[in-house]
C-alpha cells in the first residue's frame, strides 16, 4: 500500500472518463421503464475488472436494481464515506435534439446525451475515483462505498429509499456525497462559486378540485366549475411569496458578497427559489366535449417549501386563499421526512471546500440548499451529514441541459469533477493525504 499520493496522468484519466460516460449514456435507462439492469452491469464490469467487489441489489420491481461497490480499509477508524449517484434518467424526444439523446456523441468538447449531467456524469466521476484509489494502492482509514441507484427521478421508491429502508446495514455511512449542488460560472459578481447543498426544499403536492352544475356552453355562468377553478388558481399563483433567509442561504449570501449577491440570486430563475416557497401549476384537466361546461375540473400544483416551512400551515394558508366552498384543496403528497441540515464546518464539507480550492483557488465555496429533490434526503433523515455537489464549473447554457434539450457534460468538467471527488476522498478516507 502507498501512503503518499502517486502522480496521476490526468490527460489519460480524462480520456478514460470521457469514453466511460459516452458508453454509459448510450444505455437507455429512462422512465417510465427506468430499467437499470444494464447500467448496473456496465458499472460493475468496469469495477470488477480491477478487483473492486460489487453487489447488485434487486428491488421488488423487475428491471430495477441498485449497485454497491466497496473498497475496504484494513483497519477502519471510522464509518464509510459513501459516494452516491443515480442511474435512471428522464425521457428525451430524439427529434428535438442535435444528436440522438442516447448516442453518447462526443463533439465540441462535450459528451452529449440524456443523463450526461443528471446524473451519469457524477456516476463516472465516482467510478473513476474508485478506480484511481484501487490502481494507486491508496491505504484507507475508512471504507469507501460507491452507490448507484434506480428511481431517483420518480422519488426513489425502489432506489435510495428502498436501500435505506431495507439494506442500511450494508451502507451505514459516516458521510454521503451526492448530487444537488453545482459549480457556477458567470452567475455572481464574486466569481466562480461552488454551491454545496446541505439540505433541500421539501415537496407538497396539492390538487384543486372544482365542482358545480354542468350545462350548455352557450349559457355560461359565474359559478361554473371551470370558472371557479380559474379564479382559485389566480388567487393562489398571484399571492406574493414571502422572502426569508434560511441559515444556509444567509451564509451563502454572506460569502458571495452580501446584498449584491442577494439581488443576483433573486434575479435568476434557477436560484430565486432559494429565497421563498414556490407554487407551480403543472397539470390541468376538465371537460369532455367543447360545447359542454363540465361539472368537475381540477388543477395540480407542485409546491416546494423551504426547510423551515411548516407544511400543514402552508396548506392551511392555501385553503384560506382559495376560500371557495365549490373548490376543495386536496393534498396528494406530504413531505416524506423532516428537514435535517448538514453542518458546513469540518468533516466532508471542509474536505470538499479544500479540494475545490486546490483546483480553483479563487472560487467561493458556499453552503446552499437544493431547490429540487435528491436521494440525499433519505440519508439526512437518518442524521447522516449529506452534501450535494456535482463539482464541475457550469455556465447558464450548460445548466439548461438538466432535464432539457441537448443535455451535455463538458470533457473539462468531467475531468475537474473527477479531480475534486478523488481529492476529497483522499482527504476523508486515506491514511495519509499529501
What name fits each language-model region?
Residues 2-114, 135-142:
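Acidic/His- and Gly-rich active-site-bordering loop/insert found
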Residues 111, 117-195:
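Acidic/histidine-rich catalytic neighborhood of metal-dependent amide-processing enzymes
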Residues 66-70, 176, 207:
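Conserved hydrophobic/aromatic beta-strand scaffold that supports enzyme active sites
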Residues 84-86, 148, 178-179, 209-211, ...:
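Short beta-strand segments
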Residues 65-68, 110, 115-116, 182, ...:
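Cysteine-centered functional microenvironments
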Residues 50-52, 79-80, 142, 171-174, ...:
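Loop/turn elements at helix/coil->beta-strand transitions in domains of secreted/extracellular proteins
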Residues 1-5, 12, 60, 182-190, ...:
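Metal-dependent amide/peptide-bond hydrolase catalytic core
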